[in-house]
Every structure is written in structure tokens, then in C-alpha cells.
């Protein structure tokens, strides 16, 4: 049902392009279409935020913007103008939403104040200004905190250290890099000795804290879909995916880890499975964690099983064993 909604939503948004003068569909036509995605329904069910990418073929550039449309139907409107804006995420109270923007200091988390009666933004401000940039923001269920991911130097324990290493790398005349292990690149993006870590920051502002320190990617690299990290319903715990194998490039042993939002030692809750565990989601009552699991180590194309972890007994039960429908990531 969610896939059907997303498809129809995207079709309606691009339909006006095809209503213009008829001509053979060209590559330029395809590239000029607005790319719509990330639809999120407001807590009261009245509004849908989504992102749309504007393409400038002459400038060879793409710029995302946040749009809004009534969930009951109506005309869509661009909600944030004057700066790029992507990945909108509602606050639990529906009075604010977070989004990503590169207007100041690279990709950072911004907060917009929202008037639910008029469907307009009444103000906005930048929440983070971390030198290593931010992405993948996620509100806590109580609205007090926001998670985000930043690619940092694992040997650095604070922002000052990361800022210093970034400055040194920028000023260095030597741009060659030495790699002593895999993985050193995903597609065209070099890791440059950095790791993905999950940070938490108070929604009212403050210094971000690294919840997943160490020489590991947390979360692991993903091709899209469900975030590989989630808040518990009470907002006190984080569950995320990380691979701590020594030869991670040849391993699919992604595990689920839990850690307090206040910080501390993380606990591996899927250590017994040598294959991949991913895409955690807490049950609304907080008693369980649902997730995807494979059973064949080292085989990325192994089918996914829907598993449920009992937080009290620490027991796991297999709910399904099937090939996930495309686009669902196994969790519907």
C-alpha cells in the first residue's frame, strides 16, 4: 500500500510535464523532470511534506526543495524557497519539521516552525553546524532529541579534533591517499579514513554527542530505504546497525546494537547470527524490535527474514521467510 501511494503521488507530481505540446520523449525531458520523494504525513494526517529536485541542465546541477500538499488533495506548494532543502521529517507535535540543507557550512540539520492551520512555515533556524556535516536526521518520539549521521575521523573524540584534521587535509599540497585496507570507496566516494557515526543533539540546540565512537561504520553503508537506526518509543535508547568484523569488506555480518541516548557501552543483540541483521524498528509499546535478517554469511543476495527481538527475554522469533517486495526493504 505504501509503495502504491508513493507511485501515484510521484505520477501526479510529474503529470503536468506530459500535458504540454506532444513530442518524442527525449533524454533531456527525462532529466528535466522533478524528482519527487521522501513523502511524510503530518502527525494530524492533514499534510504531506515531500522533496522535489529541480534540474538545471545548462548548469549541470540538481537542487532539492521541500514541498507540501494537503493529504485530502489539492495544489502542491514549494514550502522553503531561497535555499536547498531535503529529507523533511515531522516533529511528533506537528508544529515543527526538520530538514537537511547545505546553505551554511555544508549539509546541516535545520528546523522549520509550521502553522498547521495555514500550512505555512513561520520561521526556521539552523540546528547543527558540525564541521564534518550532517545527514539522516531523526526525531525522538518525545521530540526532545534529534539523531543524525556524520562522517568523522574515528580517532577524534570531539569536534575540535575533526575540524583540525579537515583543515590539515584541505591545506596539504599532497592530495594522494594511501589505503591499507578495504573498503576504501563506495562508488565514486572515497572514505578518506573516516567513519559514519550517529550523533544526538537536543532539539532546542546544543553540542552534538557521538553515540557510536570507534573505528566502525555505524550505521553501515546502505543503498537506500529504511534507516538502519531507530529510537525506542520512550526516546531513551538507540538501536543501530554496525559491522565489527576485522575484514568487513568480505563480510555481511551486520549486527544490531543498542545503546543509551545518554551514552555508554553498546550491546550487540544479534551476535549469534553470522549473517546480516538490519533495519531495526521498535514496536509502539517498546517491548520488541522488528528487523530483517539473513542466515547465509557473506551472501548479499540471501533472502530476508522478518525477525522479532523480545527486549525483556532477549529471545528472537522468526515471523516470515520470504523474498522482500521491491522497495519495501522487508518491513511494510
Which residue stretches match the model-derived regions?
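Boundary at the C-terminal end of the N-terminal hydrophobic targeting segment
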Residues: 17-21
Amino acid at each position: 500500500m505504501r509503495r502504491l501511494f508513493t507511485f501515484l503521488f510521484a505520477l501526479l507530481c510529474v503529470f503536468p510535464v506530459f500535458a504540454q505540446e506532444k513530442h518524442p520523449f527525449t533524454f533531456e525531458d527525462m532529466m528535466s523532470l522533478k524528482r519527487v520523494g521522501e513523502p511524510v504525513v503530518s502527525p494530524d494526517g492533514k499534510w504531506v511534506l515531500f522533496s522535489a529536485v529541480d534540474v538545471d541542465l545548462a548548469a549541470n546541477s540538481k537542487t532539492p526543495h521541500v514541498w507540501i500538499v494537503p493529504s485530502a488533495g489539492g495544489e502542491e506548494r514549494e514550502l522553503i524557497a531561497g535555499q536547498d532543502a531535503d529529507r523533511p521529517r515531522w516533529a511528533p507535535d506537528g508544529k515543527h519539521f526538520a530538514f537537511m540543507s547545505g546553505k551554511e557550512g555544508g549539509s546541516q540539520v535545520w528546523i522549520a516552525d509550521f502553522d498547521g492551520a495555514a500550512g505555512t512555515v513561520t520561521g526556521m533556524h539552523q540546528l547543527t553546524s558540525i564541521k564534518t556535516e550532517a545527514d539522516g536526521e531523526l526525531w525522538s518520539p518525545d521530540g526532545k532529541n534529534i539523531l543524525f549521521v556524520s562522517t568523522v575521523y574515528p580517532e577524534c573524540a570531539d569536534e575540535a579534533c575533526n575540524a583540525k584534521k579537515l583543515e590539515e587535509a584541505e591545506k596539504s599540497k599532497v592530495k594522494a591517499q594511501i589505503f591499507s585496507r578495504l573498503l576504501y570507496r563506495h562508488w565514486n566516494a572515497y572514505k578518506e579514513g573516516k567513519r559514519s557515526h550517529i550523533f544526538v543533539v537536543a532539539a532546542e540546540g546544543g553540542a552534538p554527542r557521538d553515540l557510536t565512537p570507534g573505528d566502525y561504520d555505524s550505521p553501515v553503508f546502505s543503498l537506500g530505504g529504511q534507516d538502519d537506526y531507530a529510537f525506542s518509543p520512550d526516546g531513551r535508547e538507540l538501536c543501530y546497525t554496525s559491522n565489527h568484523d576485522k575484514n568487513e569488506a568480505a563480510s555481511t555480518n551486520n549486527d544490531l546494537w543498542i545503546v543509551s541516548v545518554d551514552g555508554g557501552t553498546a550491546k550487540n543483540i544479534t551476535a549469534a547470527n553470522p549473517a546480516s541483521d538490519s533495519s531495526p524498528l521498535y514496536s509502539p509499546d517498546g517491548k520488541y524490535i522488528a528487523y530483517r535478517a539473513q542466515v547465509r554469511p557473506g551472501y548479499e543476495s540471501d533472502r530476508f527474514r522478518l525477525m522479532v527481538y523480545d527486549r525483556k527475554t532477549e529471545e528472537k522469533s522468526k515471523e516470515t521467510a520470504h523474498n522482500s517486495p521491491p522497495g519495501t526493504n522487508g518491513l511494510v
